[in-house]
C-alpha cells in the first residue's frame, strides 16, 4: 500500500529513497524462491547462493572491483563499523605487545556511524583519534590530513559526500596525500620499534598503513564510483536504501591487500567478515539498484543540479519577503546535485519540518540517524565554528534532498508553503 497521496512531496531522499518499481517487480518474481539459507547444500539453498553470487559479481563489475572484494552487511552503518573496528582489531591482533595506540584520522562532520565508532575506540582505549575540522564551506582540506599523518596512523576515514550539507570531499586528493606519505615511509624505512614502541609494520606488495576508507552512502547516486582504483580508496561503504534498492542492506568494498578482522563471531558468512544469514532478496535489490544508478547517474545529476540551483535561489529570496535571515549551509559549488541545506534564523527547524509535513511536504532538519538522539547537528556546529559564528540553538537547519521523482513544480510548492509558514510565525517573535 502506498501511503503517499498524489499531492504529497517527498524531499527527504538523503534519509531514504523510494524503492525503484522495476526492482520491486524483478524481486517479486523470484522472492518466493529466495527463502532458503544460502549456506544450505540442498537445491533451494543453492538457488539462494547462486543469486547471492551473481549479485556480488554485479556489484563488483559496477565498481570495477574483484568479486572477492565485495562484502554484504545489514546497513551502511554496519559496513562502516566493520571497516573501522575491523582495521583496529586486526592491528591489535598483529601487534599484541604494542606500547602505543594505533592512530585514526577522521573529520568533525562525519556521519555518526564513523564518529560514534571512533569514540567507542577512544573510550575503550583501543585507538587514538584525530578529528580534522572542516572549513567554512564544509570541506576537509587534504593538507590538514597530511599534517595529521603520523607513524602510528593506520586508518584515514573521510566521507565522500556529507549526509547533512551535501558537501563533496576531495577524496582523490586525500588519497594522493596518503600515497605520498606511504612512499616517504617506505623510502625512509621507518623503524617503528625504535621510534614508536613495539609496532611492527610490514611493507608487503607496497600496501601498508594507513589505509583509506570512505563512507560513500550519499555519493553513489551522483559521484564517481565506477572505478574504485582510480578513486584511490582502500575501503568504501555504501547502502541500498540511498540508491532506490530498499532498506536493510549495506556493502563494503575492501581491497584484497587490506587485512581487517571480524567484529563479531558467528557462522562465518561473507568470508568470515560478517557472520549472519544473508538477506539475499535485499542484496539482489542492492545489485540491481547500483546497476541502474550507474546507467543514469550523469543524466540524472545534470537534471537535479538545475532543480537544486533553482531551489536555492528561490529559498534564499525568502529572506527578502519573509524578513527572516536565510542562509545556505555548505559550499554551493562542491555539493551533491540533490542537496539543499538552509538555516532560517529566528525559528525552530523542527517546527518548520512539522508544519511542512502537515502540508504534505516531507523534509528533515538533520541526519535521520541522529534525529533519535538528543542535541543539535554536530555538522552545523562544526560549520559555524569554522565560520567564527555563534551556533544558534533555536534555528538549526532544514535539509531538503531531491530525488528521481522530484520536479521543478515541487520546489514551487515548497517555497510557497514555507513562505506561508514564515508569515504565520512572524508575529510570534
Each model region followed by its residue ranges:
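Pyridoxal 5′-phosphate
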Residues: 1-429
Amino acid at each position: 500500500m502506498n501511503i503517499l497521496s498524489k499531492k504529497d512531496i517527498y524531499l527527504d531522499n538523503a534519509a531514504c529513497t523510494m524503492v525503484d518499481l522495476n526492482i520491486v517487480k524483478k524481486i517479486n518474481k523470484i522472492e518466493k524462491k529466495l527463502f532458503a539459507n544460502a549456506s544450505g547444500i540442498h537445491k533451494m539453498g543453492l538457488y539462494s547462493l547462486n543469486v547471492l553470487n551473481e549479485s556480488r559479481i554485479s556489484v563488483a563489475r559496477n565498481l570495477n572491483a574483484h568479486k572477492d572484494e565485495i562484502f554484504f552487511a545489514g546497513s551502511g552503518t554496519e559496513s562502516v563499523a566493520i571497516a573501522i573496528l575491523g582495521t583496529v582489531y586486526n592491528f591489535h591482533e598483529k601487534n599484541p605487545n604494542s606500547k602505543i595506540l594505533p592512530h585514526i584520522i577522521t573529520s568533525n562532520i562525519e556521519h555518526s556511524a564513523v564518529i560514534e565508532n571512533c569514540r567507542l575506540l577512544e573510550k575503550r582505549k583501543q585507538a587514538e583519534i584525530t578529528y580534522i575540522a572542516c572549513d567554512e564551506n564544509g570541506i576537509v582540506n587534504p593538507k590538514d590530513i597530511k599534517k595529521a599523518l603520523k607513524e602510528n596512523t593506520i586508518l584515514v576515514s573521510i566521507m565522500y559526500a556529507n549526509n547533512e550539507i551535501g558537501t563533496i570531499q576531495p577524496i582523490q586528493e586525500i588519497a594522493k596525500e596518503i600515497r605520498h606519505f606511504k612512499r616517504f615511509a617506505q623510502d625512509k624505512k621507518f623503524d617503528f620499534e625504535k621510534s614508536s614502541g613495539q609496532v611492527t609494520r610490514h611493507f608487503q606488495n607496497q600496501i601498508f598503513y594507513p589505509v583509506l576508507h570512505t563512507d560513500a552512502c550519499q555519493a553513489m547516486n551522483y559521484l564517481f564510483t565506477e572505478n574504485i582504483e582510480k578513486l584511490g580508496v582502500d575501503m568504501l561503504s555504501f547502502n541500498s536504501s540511498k540508491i532506490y534498492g530498499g532498506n536493510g542492506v549495506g556493502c563494503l568494498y575492501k581491497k584484497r591487500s587490506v587485512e581487517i578482522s571480524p567484529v563479531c563471531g558467528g557462522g562465518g558468512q561473507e568470508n568470515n567478515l560478517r557472520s549472519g544469514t544473508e538477506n539475499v532478496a535485499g542484496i539482489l535489490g542492492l545489485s540491481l539498484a547500483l546497476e541502474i544508478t550507474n546507467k543514469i547517474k550523469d543524466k540524472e545529476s545534470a537534471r537535479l543540479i538545475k532543480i537544486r540551483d533553482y531551489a536555492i535561489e528561490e529559498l534564499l529570496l525568502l529572506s527578502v519577503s519573509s524578513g527572516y535571515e536565510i542562509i545556505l549551509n555548505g559550499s554551493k559549488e562542491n555539493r551533491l546535485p540533490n542537496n539543499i541545506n538552509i538555516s532560517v534564523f529566528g525559528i525552530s527547524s523542527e517546527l518548520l519540518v512539522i508544519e511542512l509535513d502537515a502540508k504534505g511536504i516531507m523534509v528533515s532538519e538533520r541526519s535521520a540517524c541522529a534525529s533519535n538522539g538528543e542535541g543539535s547537528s554536530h555538522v552545523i556546529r562544526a560549520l559555524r565554528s569554522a565560520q567564527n559564528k555563534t551556533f544558534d540553538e533555536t534555528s538549526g537547519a532544514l535539509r531538503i534532498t531531491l530525488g528521481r521523482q522530484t520536479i521543478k513544480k515541487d520546489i514551487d510548492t515548497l517555497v510557497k508553503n514555507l513562505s506561508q509558514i514564515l508569515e504565520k510565525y512572524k508575529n510570534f517573535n
